[in-house]
Amino acid sequence: MTRLATLITLAGLLAVSPGAYAQRNRNDTGGSTGAEGLNSLAVKAGLLYFGTASDTRNFADEPYMSVVNNTNEFGMIVPENSMKWEATEKEPGRFSFANADRVRALTKANGQMLRCHALTWHSQLPNFVKTTAWTRDTLTAAIESHISNEVGHFAGDCYAWDVVNEAVNENGSFRDSPFHRTLGTDFLAISFRAAAAADPNAKLYYNDFNIETPGPKANAAMGIVRLLKEQGVRIDGVGFQGHLTVGSTPSRAQLASQLQRFADLGVEVTYTELDIRHKSLPVSSRAAQDQARDYVSVIGSCLDVTACVGVMVWQPTDKYSWIPETFPGTGDACLFDANMNPKPAYTSVSSLLAAAAATAPASVVPPASVTTSKTPIQAGAGRETVSIAGLTLALSSLAFGMFML
């Protein structure tokens, strides 16, 4: 931790009101997992956050929200759907951010970081994007308008944006979409440049699934990073979605090696949508332990790579997981069961992070509202480079044992 970062952290502590301390303590005791949750352990182990997806459809579920609101468990929230194009601009130029604003308000009230998802994606598009007879000029203008309005609306509040999501097929070719059909690969630079202009401080990510191991798709994703850098376009990170299967998850060493391949391109990396589903249900005790092992492999790989800044799970609970609907007959992919009880996978991840925290160098951890600089983390660089993004939410990712009230 640099001296500057330490001073920033102390400034944040001095700025915190007694009410904010009380809010932190209420959050820290929420849920059913005890005082030392995954986020606090992850931060002590050297990550910036351990977070989860959620959205407004879940907000009325009090037992669920007691866990999601617990900053000791989750230091970052990403909305599942309420920031996607279909949700925010159903008709050209008519924007609605009501649900996304509710997610942002939740993170501000809790002192959590906000991850923002997703801007240019072939799926969940409004009809006008799918059906208009676009030209290069008109589609470029539509992309720039959508991104400038949405990213501008949330400017200063998003740690990162998934600027382009799932642009390539398994064989490494580009997905068919209005964007690629009309603009070729130029849609990548158009999207990233628009996002950078609308919020210079947000991290800009390419996000995809099935890039956790080497192959044509991962190579194509690396090609996107190289292409943007060659064009002088800022890209700060690559998101590994991590939708994996119990028993087929690569080893910790294999996963870390793949993370490092991307980090060597000069970007930070993170797991953005982690869940590990069982192939069949109900789940045996042996299968539950296998799932726990696989979760440890994934999260351990992030700990092993300096440029891996954190982990996001795609919902904390099986109750709201997308898996059963999308992959019938499979499921139970999350860390909590449908009744919000921690599963063996949770216990194993907690033990992993606790062990890593116990051996991590002692340092003062920056609060959630002090984000890493926009300069990409290079392979071998430390996790300590920080810049101030406002100190008003200064509590959520502190080392929670430092100050006891």
UniProtKB/Swiss-Prot annotation:
One of its GO terms (cellular component) is plasma membrane. Residues 32-352 form the GH10 domain. Its EC number is 3.2.1.8. It is an enzyme of class 3 (hydrolase). It holds the Pfam family Glyco_hydro_10. It is found in: Cell membrane; Secreted. GO terms for biological process: xylan catabolic process. It catalyses: Endohydrolysis of (1->4)-beta-D-xylosidic linkages in xylans. A lipid is attached at G380 (GPI-anchor amidated glycine). Pathway: Glycan degradation; xylan degradation. The active site is at E166, E273. Belongs to the glycosyl hydrolase 10 (cellulase F) family. Endo-1,4-beta-xylanase involved in the hydrolysis of xylan, a major structural heterogeneous polysaccharide found in plant biomass representing the second most abundant polysaccharide in the biosphere, after cellulose. This is Endo-1,4-beta-xylanase 5. It comes from Pyricularia oryzae (strain 70-15 / ATCC MYA-4617 / FGSC 8958).
